[in-house]
From Swiss-Prot:
Gene: trmD
UniProt binding sites for S-adenosyl-L-methionine: G113, I133, G134, D135, Y136, V137, L138
Enzyme class: transferase
UniProt main location, coarse: cytoplasm
Protein name: tRNA (guanine-N(1)-)-methyltransferase
Reaction it catalyzes: guanosine(37) in tRNA + S-adenosyl-L-methionine = N(1)-methylguanosine(37) in tRNA + S-adenosyl-L-homocysteine + H(+)
Length: 261
């Protein structure tokens, strides 16, 4: 998959995605990543990329022309059509379902804003989607772009050594439940012992335990996902059993995610 990133700080993106799974994806040719700096397409001795906003107010706004020229160069580098996705807190929220849809694209262009944002006229005429990674504000779109790259590329065939890893991740199943707990050696530790069922060798019991734990975690931490999930009759029976053995009111449920913070 080819991903082009337009950013005033291209080194930021390179550093963020140059390690681990995504770094190996680049080495294997599964991710073709290209960084573009609008400043390289700005005019004048100072290569200015921003100016004061009309109407006054704090901060600066990114100029249309450097962005337009940069985007033209991006499109000229590869004739394959690609949506321009602007990382913005005003965009639609990135979730696993949307990541799967983006992963089906052969190519996409990510646009990172800075300062107070980008001239609205450029957004109106060129941007195909505004995408947010959460209801908070960052200094720029680079972190968001790195998140999108990671979320999308790990879904590409051959990126993960074990394809089942992606299928078992939180939000990845058809019902979008949270993942079950994972344990490794040693089996006994001062922090606690590995549940006996996982050491039993009984794969039917292990599968049931993992499903039950997935339901429990989702019910405690993200009850909204339980409401949206397409649970089977067996799942609902498991969930009813969980609710009987883990009675918690709303305040207690909320405290689970915070762990006392």
């Amino acid at each position: 998959m080819r991903i082009d990133v337009i950013s005033l700080f291209p080194e930021f993106i390179t550093q963020c995605v140059g390690f681990g799974v995504i770094g190996r994806a680049q080495e294997r040719g599964l991710l073709d990543l290209h960084n573009w700096n609008p400043r390289d397409y700005a005019q004048g001795n100072y290569r200015r990329v921003d100016d004061r906003p009309f109407g006054g107010g704090p901060g600066m706004v990114m100029l249309i022309e450097p962005l337009r020229a940069c985007l033209e160069a991006v499109r000229a580098a590869d004739p394959q059509p690609a949506p321009l996705i602007y990382l913005s807190p005003q965009g639609v929220l990135l979730n696993q379902s949307r990541a799967r849809k983006l992963a089906m694209l052969p190519r996409m262009i990510l646009l990172c804003g800075r300062y107070e944002g980008i001239d609205e006229r450029f957004i109106t005429h060129e941007v195909n989607m505004e995408l947010s990674i959460g209801d908070y504000v960052l200094s720029g779109g680079e972190l968001g772009a790195a998140v999108v790259v990671d979320a999308v590329i790990r879904l590409q065939e051959g990126v993960l050594n074990d394809a089942e890893s992606a299928k078992q991740d939180s939000f990845e199943a058809v019902d979008s439940l949270l993942d079950y707990p994972h344990y490794t050696h040693p089996s006994n530790h001062a922090f606690g012992n590995v549940p006996e069922v996982l050491r039993s060798g009984n794969h039917v019991a292990i599968t049931r335990w993992r499903r039950q734990q997935s339901l429990l975690r989702t019910w405690l931490r993200r009850p909204d996902l339980i409401d949206e999930a397409r649970l089977s009759k067996a799942d609902r029976l498991l969930l009813d059993e969980i609710k009987r053995t883990h009675p918690m009111d709303t305040d207690q449920k909320a405290s689970v995610s915070w762990r006392g913070v």
